[in-house]
Amino acid sequence: GQRVGSMGFPNTNIEILGPTSDDVGWLNAGARIVVHGNAGNGTANAMAQGKIYVAGNIGARGMTMTKHNPRFDPPELWVLGSAGDYFGEFMAGGIAVICGFEAQVPDNILGHRPFVGMVGGKVFFHGPYRGYSRRDAKLISMGDEEWAWLNQNLHVFLDHIGRTELVRVFSDRSQWQLLVARTPQEKIQRPMKSIHSFHTGVWEKELGRGGLIGDLMQLDRSPVPLITTAQLRRYVPIWENRKYAAPCEATCPTGIPVQERWQLVRE
């Protein structure tokens, strides 16, 4: 079912002998979860501690909104195959390892638009990909310490899922890549669009002459200053209290809309 192992506690071991549904390890707080098959969407969503081992592929939005309390070991997600779309969205901590073996999409093991909004954590991956959010994440060279950690824990992962024969497949360090979140100082800033460039490049292009409705309109489309007066004051505020009713109020089957009912209670 859904959310197996959710809010799992430390010293808890859950082993699923087959594929599983969505949200495996949701809000996991320390449990070790082994899935002998594919996992659905939302795997390791908001996980804070613990480990999840998946002997297959995972669906969309895996490892999203994770976090890491420095007092404890970081959460870990190990995937033998590939990740689905929007992987690592708003990831704020933890370690993910995508092995890319028999991936669902062999030429893109990280899925569509991964790591959007990523602010923490790191991801090891083995295989081709089609890009990621460069504004939020960056590739770095893997140091000896990272490789030693990956190599050691890779044996543990393969042992838990019963695929130790794949150790040689993943033993080539040059085939692995490491991606980490950018610091706030490293964030790639988007250029600010001026009002003039928006007016000429977007507004006039879509709504001006030759646009979607520009040829059908005869309205005054000149720029309106911040405080308008005289003829350019296109909207004049008037007081029309209780003149119009919302659809729910007008068609209320009881004849006493909610706001009037509470008004009667107050009175």
Regions found by a protein language model. Give the residues of each.
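Ferredoxin-type iron-sulfur electron-transfer modules and their immediate structural context
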Residues: R190-E267
